[in-house]
């Protein structure tokens, strides 16, 4: 099992991120995506990989992590052009899958940019189609996609579960 925690540049609820970290940090690699590096800096996390065109991250924070990467040789930067066919988060997910990810936990994938939120939810389907378990977590939701039978466990703090078909015919047996 190879787990990744991706901290993207959307709205990050520090409580839900801390829950992800508590559950998965010891066995996971961490990828910061563009402005997600600000969250890493705020909570003192040194990511394994930093991906982005850095159009929304503080130049000072990016500079601090670049210096750290030169000294430590354990932080990988994936610099992207601002004109590209994929979002920064999409590139981070592709990077994790290329490294053999089996589970991906994403924080900061929802927020004020509806276009990015929708794109990120669509990325869950790409992960499911490739056999990778991927989850977007924020302070109100845990979102995933499945394309086969799955058992579901109750998560503490969540009272409801919704099933929404995405991209085709779905049958639900309860």
Predicted regions and their residues:
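Short, acidic/small-residue loops that bind anionic groups at enzyme active sites
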Residues: 126-143
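Non-catalytic positions within long, well-ordered alpha-helices that form the structural scaffold/packing
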Residues: 41, 97-100
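General beta-strand structural signal in soluble alpha/beta enzymes
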Residues: 7, 31-34, 52, 78-79, ...
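Conserved small/polar residues in nucleotide/adenosyl-binding loops
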Residues: 172-174
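Short, glycine-/small-residue-rich phosphate/pyrophosphate-handling segment
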Residues: 117-118, 146-164
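N-terminal beta-strand-loop-alpha-helix module at the start
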Residues: 1-67
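Glycine/small-residue-rich loop that forms an oxyanion/phosphate-binding "nest" at active or ligand-binding sites
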Residues: 59-93
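Short Gly/Thr/Asp-enriched flexible loops that form oxyanion-binding sites at enzyme active sites
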Residues: 111-125
């Amino acid at each position: 099992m190879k787990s990744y925690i991706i901290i993207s540049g959307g709205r990050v609820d520090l409580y839900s991120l801390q829950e992800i970290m508590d559950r998965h940090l010891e066995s996971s690699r961490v990828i910061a995506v563009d402005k997600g590096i600000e969250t890493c800096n705020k909570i003192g996390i040194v990511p394994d990989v930093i991906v982005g065109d850095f159009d929304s991250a503080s130049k000072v924070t990016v500079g601090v992590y670049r210096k750290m990467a030169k000294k430590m040789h354990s932080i990988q930067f994936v610099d992207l052009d601002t004109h590209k066919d994929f979002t920064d988060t999409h590139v981070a997910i592709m990077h994790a899958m290329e490294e053999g990810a089996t589970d991906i936990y994403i924080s900061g994938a929802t927020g004020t940019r509806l276009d990015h939120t929708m794109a990120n939810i669509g990325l869950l389907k790409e992960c499911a189609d490739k056999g990778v378990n991927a989850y977007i977590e924020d302070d109100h939701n845990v979102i995933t996609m499945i394309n086969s039978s799955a058992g579901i466990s109750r998560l503490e703090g969540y009272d409801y579960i919704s099933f929404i078909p995405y991209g085709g015919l779905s049958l639900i047996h309860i």
